[in-house]
Amino acid sequence: MEKNLPDIFFFPNCVNVFSYKYSQDEFSNMSKTERDSFSLAVFPVIKHRWHNAHVVKHKGIYKVSTEARGKKVSPPSLGKPAHINLTAKQYIYSEHTISFECYSFLKCITNTEINSFDEYILRGLLEAGNSLQIFSNSVGKRTDTIGVLGNKYPFSKIPLASLTPKAQREIFSAWISHRPVVLTGGTGVGKTSQVPKLLLWFNYLFGGFSTLDKITNFHERPVILSLPRIALVRLHSNTILKSLGFKVLDGSPISLRYGSIPEELINKQPKKYGIVFSTHKLSLTKLFSYGTLIIDEVHEHDQIGDIIIAVARKHHTKIDSMFLMTATLEDDRERLKVFLPNPAFIHIPGDTLFKISEVFIHNKINPSSRMAYIEEEKRNLVTAIQMYTPPDGSSGIVFVASVAQCHEYKSYLEKRLPYDMYIIHGKVLDIDEILEKVYSSPNVSIIISTPYLESSVTIRNVTHIYDMGKVFVPAPFGGSQEFISKSMRDQRKGRVGRVNPGTYVYFYDLSYMKSIQRIDSEFLHNYILYANKFNLTLPEDLFIIPTNLDILWRTKEYIDSFDISTETWNKLLSNYYMKMIEYAKLYVLSPILAEELDNFERTGELTSIVREAILSLNLRIKILNFKHKDDDTYIHFCKILFGVYNGTNATIYYHRPLTGYMNMISDTIFVPVDNN
């Protein structure tokens, strides 16, 4: 469907687009093209104003029940009006008088082509649209946006590139075409903060109709923005809630979905046309109940995110529109061209608002000498922070590979630098409190972080990035540190230059960068289980295909050996984390055990019942050797004796030396097997 967005339906960015009510005199002075723009108002008016409305007679004049109170009456016969009263907004016949809006209400019936609308219908649609506050203009003021979506406060002023008229037209044309859309944008253009809001607006106006060429029945469904982490769900939903003029969730178009969500973050009066911010896992549970699907952070290749893309592509007729948003297409453009059916690529150009200077600090040690490389890196980092120091009251972010390195580098820096030091990563619970300290401190703050800060939280006062160029890539029963990809570098660099000029200091040779194929270092059971649930053909229906297909087929055989029906697996997928696939054998035993095991997965509380149940699975690990690490830690070199990765080597830390065997309770809890 080729449709251009008329100017009168732009979302009010409160910079050069404002909410506006048009007068009948203005309509009279418009060109035919401008007048015809109002024909599209029939769709939001039918949904939000005329749904369940009827004709009444009010003070002798026929009106719509949404205009005035009155007794329900049979509609009058309509021919060409004898007279038009622009001031009273009424059509006058010899026997009766009818409001502009009521005339349009009676004329706009199912299957009517919108290009057949005459001036009389368009004038009524103008009045109905004014009542809904759906129109916009290049003149106005912020306060005119109060009430547009039921909001008590005005929309935020947004000068970002994604809400310019040009970008709005391009995004609308892609959305209404029903083609899959891949959207990229420069740093700070508002991909995540504004594009979902724009798609919410389009959904409010036109969502649910199969065509915008004629009047049809509609099936209203919300938009969903699917995100890889709870922190992102909370951050972006709050940003958009406030920018739309709301202070509370209830009754707003914003809803949140993630596991163990607190009561106060549940919208008890959601809008059918609204937008749901959800973690990937919960998005999958009701994927086809949404009209527009937005998948963010595609470049991260979160496992469930990649599965959503595969499912949406397989069942694209069940979704009206799909948007994939990514920081960069460096690694994925060619695959997306082949994988998606006739995709549209949209790039919103934009650079950081302020200049970013780059500084390279050379490490003279080869990375193959891991410990020596890291020691040299830490020395270089101290020198770099001394030479390139954030101003007082500002902050710098040090990107390291892992949580353990956060603590290692913080301890090292604290002994050598006089600045405030903080750690932020995905497992830190009091991030808001830490940021309050960072923002209120008159001193320099240095934040040591994992890749979590690439996108999860925006630090307002950051001026410097110190990038070690590493990421920890988890693997079954282990993992490894790898150099980052270009997309990760771009994300890290883009943390500065938004509010002030920034400096990006990097400590790695650019030739070390490489694409990271995460699927080759993941447990693959989710791909099997969701493929069964959504009838995907493996491996060709997967967005990213594993390099070693033998592991995929071994995983399938292992899952089949559990002797659990597809229907039961689907229930387990919808209700439980199953951080270890073997837990499925316990979830099906009894509701009481399932409840306690679920609580363990969510909170870490290990009851004796759950402990004994997991031990009964005999998830055994053989200890090959050990060595002393420090006062209370021993490194054990082991071999996995169960599951798909039977025979895989693993390294496990324990507070005393062990021999023989241990049983696995979770990825962090191990129980020695009694040798007696």
Curated annotation (Swiss-Prot):
It is found in: Virion. Its EC number is 3.6.4.13. GO terms for molecular function: ATP binding; ATP hydrolysis activity; RNA binding; RNA helicase activity. Changing residue 497 to A: Defect in ATP hydrolysis and RNA unwinding. Changing residue 492 to A: Defect in ATP hydrolysis and RNA unwinding. Keywords: ATP-binding, Helicase, Hydrolase, Nucleotide-binding, Transcription, Virion. Gene3D superfamilies: P-loop containing nucleotide triphosphate hydrolases (3.40.50.300). GO terms for cellular component: virion component. Changing residue 297 to A: Strongly reduces NTPase and helicase activities. The keyword ATP-binding applies. It comes from the Viruses. It catalyses: ATP + H2O = ADP + phosphate + H(+). Transmembrane segments: none annotated. Changing residue 192 to A: Inactivates ATPase and helicase activities. ATP binds at residues 185-192. Residues 366-535 form the Helicase C-terminal domain. InterPro entries: DEAD/DEAH_box_helicase_dom, DNA/RNA_helicase_DEAH_CS, Helicase_ATP-bd, Helicase_C-like, NPH-II, P-loop_NTPase. Induction: Expressed in the intermediate phase of the viral replicative cycle. Changing residue 299 to A: Activates NTPase without need for a nucleic acid cofactor. NTP-dependent helicase that catalyzes unidirectional unwinding of 3'tailed duplex RNAs and plays an important role during transcription of early mRNAs, presumably by preventing R-loop formation behind the elongating RNA polymerase. Might also play a role in the export of newly synthesized mRNA chains out of the core into the cytoplasm. Required for replication and propagation of viral particles. Monomer. Belongs to the DEAD box helicase family. DEAH subfamily. This is RNA helicase NPH-II. The gene is OPG084.
